[in-house]
From Swiss-Prot:
Keywords: DNA replication, Plasmid. It comes from the Bacteria. One of its GO terms (molecular function) is DNA binding. This is Putative replication protein A. GO terms for biological process: DNA replication; regulation of DNA-templated transcription. The lineage of its organism: Bacteria, Pseudomonadati, Pseudomonadota, Alphaproteobacteria, Hyphomicrobiales. The keyword ATP-binding does not apply. Belongs to the ParA family. It holds the Pfam family MerR_1. Disulfide bonds: none annotated.
Length: 407
């Protein structure tokens, strides 16, 4: 350095909050660019065709029955490939269901499984305190499976991160679709939930999308509780159940994707729930975390019960997610859970699969991805796992209605 050169000023340290704001902005912009390339804002999410075997499984009939209907000119006309393979759209599958319900009904089976007189709206809260448990993946595939099997379903995204909404074609950073907060808020701007519900690309499945605005409920509720001139805050735990009562007749099942923390949103969802599904990754740290979650949850719900807001459930279950059966420690942890909780653990597990994670890259579920886009064995193994889990949950829902399980 030249002796006459001016001294170089030391670099100013960057404040942590400035650094994370800069990096958060960078991530958002890059992800937004990728999202725009894969799913432009004016794009509409479409749904693939379903193969004959898939349609037969979702309808609960044999493939030969569907072939016979086609040959007799009954029901919607399937799309036929150059190789002669038949496939149906989800809308056509719904038409087939209606046709079978009218012309193929037996005492053993109703092809349209809508609620009957005296059967209660089923509200399934999907919860976990720890991220990475497959909570949103579970909620999305369950809601879609129930719609594909003929139920009228409302999915409610209560997680401000809005992953469930993204999987259904909503882009919270662009769409600004109203969230459930609009039906929960304590001021005179509260709206009916019917104004917030949006259709999805799955016939029979609607959604209440999420956005960061939901976080406002966590701040508003303590203020409302301290307001001596109103009782609204003191009965905050009734707000979701009251909102859902406005659309009670429109749906058979509501699937709520709860946020991954024990805040007012989660508590309000649990007091509205008729059943709870706790997702758990079978690793020691995850199970330990879940144990703490259960202790905290029980401690919070007890005083709420004492003021008349008991959580009255038809059922609750633990679902093992992202399971690798060949992993010895995971298999041991599954055995540990089954020994401890017996019938409270679902018999079927959601297997870890690259098929599910690969679909997530393009903001799709496995029910949206075409088999030809993946290794066939990987796809089928993941699909069999998902269908087995979801079918078991549907049986629990139907049992809550007092229906006999039809194999």
């Amino acid at each position: 350095m030249n002796a006459n050169s001016p001294p170089i000023a030391p670099a100013q340290p960057m404040h942590f909050e400035d650094l994370i704001l800069e990096q958060g902005d960078l991530i958002s912009k890059k992800l937004h660019l990728l999202s725009m390339q894969q799913f432009p804002p004016n794009a509409k999410k479409l749904l693939r065709q379903f193969s004959l075997s898939e349609v037969a499984q979702f309808l609960g009939v044999s493939q030969s029955t569907l072939k016979k209907l086609h040959l007799e000119g009954k029901g919607p006309l399937p799309q036929t490939s150059s190789s002669g393979r038949r496939s149906y759209s989800a809308e056509q599958m719904a038409e087939l269901r209606q046709y079978l319900d009218q012309h193929g009904r037996s005492e053993a089976r109703n092809y349209v499984p809508h609620r009957r007189s005296g059967e209660k709206l089923q509200v399934i809260a999907v919860v976990n305190f720890k991220g990475g448990s497959g909570k949103t993946t579970t909620a999305a595939h369950l809601a879609q499976y129930m719609a594909l099997t003929g139920h009228r379903v409302l999915a409610v995204d209560l997680d401000p991160q809005a992953s469930l909404s993204s999987l259904h074609g909503f882009q919270p950073e662009l769409d600004m679709s109203p969230s459930l907060y609009e039906a929960l808020r304590y001021d005179d701007q509260r709206r009916s939930i019917s104004e917030i519900i949006q259709p999805t690309n799955f016939p029979g499945l609607d959604i209440v999308p999420a956005n960061l605005e939901l976080q406002e409920y966590e701040y508003d509720t303590p203020l409302a509780m301290s307001n001596k001139s109103s009782n609204d805050g003191k009965t905050f735990f009734t707000r979701i159940s009251r909102a859902l009562s406005e659309v009670n007749d429109r749906y058979d099942v509501v699937v709520i994707d709860c946020p991954p923390q024990l805040g007012y949103l989660t508590i309000t969802a649990l007091t509205a729930a008729t059943s709870v599904l706790i997702t758990i990754h079978p690793q020691m740290l995850d199970v330990m975390s879940m144990g703490q979650f259960l202790l905290m949850l029980g401690g919070i719900l007890k005083p709420i019960r004492d003021v008349g807001a008991a959580v009255n459930l038809e059922w609750y279950r633990y679902l093992i997610t992202r399971y690798e059966p060949t992993d010895g420690p995971q298999a041991q942890m599954v055995g540990f859970m089954q020994t401890l909780f017996h019938q409270f653990v679902l018999k079927n597990q959601m297997l870890k699969s690259t098929a599910v994670s690969d679909a997530g890259i393009t903001k799709q579920t496995l029910y949206e991805v075409d088999k030809s886009q993946m290794t066939r064995s990987t796809y089928e193994r993941a699909m069999d796992s998902l269908n087995a889990v979801n079918a078991e949950i549907v049986e629990l829902v139907h049992a809550s209605w007092g229906r006999k399980v039809v194999s």
